[in-house]
UniProtKB/Swiss-Prot annotation:
Function: GTPase that plays an essential role in the late steps of ribosome biogenesis.
GO biological process, one term: ribosome biogenesis
Name this polypeptide is given: GTPase Der
SMART domains tied to this protein: AAA
Ranges where the EngA-type G domain occurs: 4-169, 178-353
One family name in Pfam for this protein: MMR_HSR1
Amino acid sequence: MALPVVAIIGRPNVGKSTLVNRLCQSREAIVHDEPGVTRDRTYQDGFWRDRDFKVVDTGGLVFDDDSEFLPEIREQANLALEEAVVALVIVDGQEGITTADESIAEFLRSRSGKTLVVVNKCESPEQGLAMAAQFWKLGLGEPYPISAIHGVGTGDLLDQVVNLFPSKDLDEVSDSPVQLAIIGRPNVGKSSLLNSICGETRAIVSSIRGTTRDTIDTRITHQGKEWKLVDTAGIRRRRSVNYGPEFFGINRSFKAIERSDVCVLVIDALDGVTEQDQRLAGRIEQEGRACLIVINKWDAVEKDSHTMSAMEKDIRSKLYFLDWAQMIFTSAVTGQRVEGIFALATLAVDQSRRRVTTSVVNEVLTEALKWRSPPTTRGGKQGRLYYGTQVAINPPSFTLFVNEPKLFGETYRRYIERQIREGLGFEGTPIKLFWRGKQQRDVEKDMARQQKGVRN
């Protein structure tokens, strides 16, 4: 199952970015909440009480009718709330209830979903309860006083957030159709590919960029498996997109990536990999989606016996974000190899949903440690990798318990990821590793409990 998502909602200047940094123990969020500065949703990883989750910050939500970005901001907030398990509404305890807070509360009351009111800037625990009491008037339930900058009350808040998460179940796989999103720049042949797959004219096919301005869903059955195919609007640089219907189509395209089980990234064989293709590859990897790369218009390429291998090498060097993805060369016009898309997509989805027992994970880690020990600092302190366990699927996610995460640099982390992939497979899907610090005595207790459970 995918990691649960926590949405951060609120007006500007209430400390949302500071809270994100506090919850995720990072400094990645830009602490500058001028209205309109952050309109895109940004994601960071969080961890509390043995639960991994995603935190999405939508930026400052305003309802000023004069705001140029009002439709865009509302769209981003709606998308964040749709995917969130729980929404945290951030308000300013020192300033009190404002008209903007009331507008946001009214906006949220019209929606279903779990919501917690978080009263920030309550630096004193004693005064915090009194400052928070007035926010009962918003009608969103109990307010939680915190100080994002000092960490006061954030532990209690996280306890409540985690309690609202669905129970962990690695076997939970939806019976709904497999969602396959067809992603790519404008005019690379996405709609033609969809029509070729379905054997009918389902999407408008045109050489004019931007013909498909919305996502188009098509349900089909292939070899007994139900599929939901999504043809998305062509995605290009935001500065080249005029504000209007095309903008919202691109937003829904990004949403299609987030909600898909597998993405088909379509590359134009005549153009090769562009900067925008690389951005899309990065987005797919960032969202943790299974993926296959389709090189379309292969019929239009002049080629010899070496062309395919040379092009694959060139494409893989540029799409390094997706070095784990399978690749297939197709022609939507002639139907060449289009049927093979289903086989590769099925493999990618199955791998993204696969789970591995803790004992098998640790066999791979033990072997990796034999070949290459963790690095040692100049002061003589060495990293220790105690054990690992799979905590989620779609994408396969593993928590690795170590003495101090900061002792493991990016080079060694990439080495461990490669060893896990080589030892366990996972073709066509990214894998996520979460490095968590833990005391040796706690590790020994965990291992003892696991061994006892096996004996019982």
